[in-house]
């Protein structure tokens, strides 16, 4: 199993307003990261265009090269499930667990 211990985070102080359509793009983009990073060289960037004037969600996920593909996916799944709590609906975040990392923003990086 992957090591999902929390290492560090950097959270934007600006919050996504409740009910904002950006949540939808962000959710879709995080699901994309979770599903594809293990099969994309363990370092994968993607984006989801916004609907209804919502900003595009940009993201990147990285897994440690020493873990299996299934552990990479499991680590990112764990992190996606925790990122809202760690960065409480921030418009941008970087969170590192021992075996994986996710960054998301409203701008390309």
Swiss-Prot record:
Residues holding alpha-D-mannopyranose: 12, 94, 105
Top-level taxon of the source organism: Eukaryota
Disulfide bridge positions per record: 11-87, 63-72, 75-100
Domain Gnk2-homologous: 4-109
Entries under Pfam families matching the protein: Stress-antifung
Key word Transmembrane helix present: no
Molecular function GO terms recorded: D-mannose binding
PROSITE patterns: GNK2
PANTHER family given in the database record: ANTIFUNGAL PROTEIN GINKBILOBIN-2-LIKE (PTHR32080), GNK2-HOMOLOGOUS DOMAIN-CONTAINING PROTEIN (PTHR32080:SF54)
Function, as annotated: Exerts antifungal activity through its carbohydrate-binding specificity.
Entry protein name: Antifungal protein ginkbilobin-like protein
Species assigned in the record: Picea abies
């Amino acid at each position: 199993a992957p090591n999902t211990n929390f290492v560090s985070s950097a959270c934007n102080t600006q919050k996504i307003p409740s009910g904002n359509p950006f949540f939808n793009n962000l959710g879709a983009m995080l699901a994309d990261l979770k599903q594809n990073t293990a099969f994309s060289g363990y370092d994968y960037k993607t984006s989801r265009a916004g609907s209804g004037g919502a900003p595009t969600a940009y993201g990147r996920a990285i897994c440690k090269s020493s873990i299996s593909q299934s552990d990479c996916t499991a680590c990112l799944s764990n992190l996606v499930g925790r990122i809202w709590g760690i960065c409480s609906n921030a418009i941008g975040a970087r969170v590192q667990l021992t075996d994986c990392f996710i960054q998301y923003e409203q701008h390309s990086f």
